[in-house]
Amino acid sequence: MIYGISLGPGDPDLITLKGLNILKSADKIYYPGSLFSNQNKVSYSLSILEHYNLDSSKLNGFFLEMNLDRVQVKTIYETTFLKIKEDYDNGLTIAIVSEGDINTFSSFSYLLSKFKANQLKVELIPGITSYALGAAEQLTPLCLQNEKLIILPRVQTTKELEEALVNFDTVVLMKIKSVIAVIDQVVSKQTYNINYSERLGTDKQFISSDWDEIKTREIPYFSLITLRK
């Protein structure tokens, strides 16, 4: 059996009991990480897993290059799939983890398509998203009653963002590291309720509603902005 386990956004206590119990009983645990141009490997998922006192011999990382060229990424997904399928065929219980929720911008989804194509048994354990934790930390509801919510990853144009702010009550912006200039052009012209969060659930967590402070920060990958009218 293959399990997709959501780890939550960073705080190790935010995993579900079901997810943690599966991790403890799994024969193999696969986790994603990032491979940078200097060949450094970093895994946010592993930093969460290390809190659970798991047998380190069960842990297997797969590392994806942090660029828009998908050649290396596709190769890693294929080789990782083949390793997992071998484990599966040998009758092992396999867990594959993802930070946040495994159904939301997760690298696991690319493996899932391969599992389904090969008719492997899979169960997904959902989890807490970063924007849900961000709203909780700032004591601010994402939406109420008939309000509408949209999630935009790596918003490319001011027009796209402006249209979202007209048509939706709450706009969650993810993957913002490279598009702060686009966001600035919009939020500097009109007043919005701005909630910025980075590295949620970790000892490096930072939260702010001051746009002048936000736009001058060095924005990390694990960051997001929530805008409300």
Question: PLM ranges: what are they?
Answer:
Residues 1-12, 17-20, 24-120, 212-215, ...:
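Class I S-adenosyl-L-methionine
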Residues 2, 165-229:
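A contiguous loop/helix-start segment that scaffolds small-molecule binding in enzyme catalytic cores
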Residues 21-22, 88, 141-145, 162-166, ...:
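Solvent-exposed alpha-helices and their adjacent loops that cap or buttress functional pockets
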Residues 34-36, 99, 121, 148, ...:
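Flexible, glycine/proline-enriched loop segments at strand-loop-helix junctions
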Residues 65-70, 130, 157-159, 202-205:
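A short acidic, often aromatic-flanked loop/helix-cap motif at beta-alpha or helix-coil junctions
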Residues 73-80, 138-140, 164-168, 208-214:
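Short, surface-exposed amphipathic charged segments that create phosphate/polyanion-binding patches used
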